[in-house]
Amino acid sequence: MVLEEGEESCLLISRYALEELKYHGRKEPVTWETSGLRAWLNREFLDMAFSPEEQSAIRITEVDNSLGNPVFHTEGGNNTEDRVFLLSREEVMTYFPSEGERLCEPTLHSKRASLAGYSHWWTRSPGSMPYYADYINYRGAVISQNVDNKFTAIRPVIRVMTEYLHREE
């Protein structure tokens, strides 16, 4: 799903909620920079989901984590440089302004979905406590939960070279 299209690159997000994973392996203070999920997305997921040719078209993106969580005033940590990342709480509100637009169906591979048929999905933003992260629930609301919750899916975001998307095969 295209979030932004520019001359040089396009910002894409998974249309579906993919794998359900913990944001971090333990319930401890963590930011996007130090999260287990960030490490997994930029290593195992990148290698598993994309061919070498596709990986060469994915740009490194400077990910701004400076805002943290403006509602709970929790620190966002340092900015990062990632090939795969998650949207922040604020970016979710920008790209998906209404709760209905934030609803996300799971893939068949995803383990769980709510009775309404939609998945919870992580943001990269910290939650109400240093060991919480924000996620979007099955109703499209932004909520905080423990970083070691394993029943929340991911919607990876990548920035891809525009010429790669529009190439002739």
For every predicted segment, state its role.
Residues 1-169:
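Collagenous Gly-X-Y triple-helix signature in extracellular proteins
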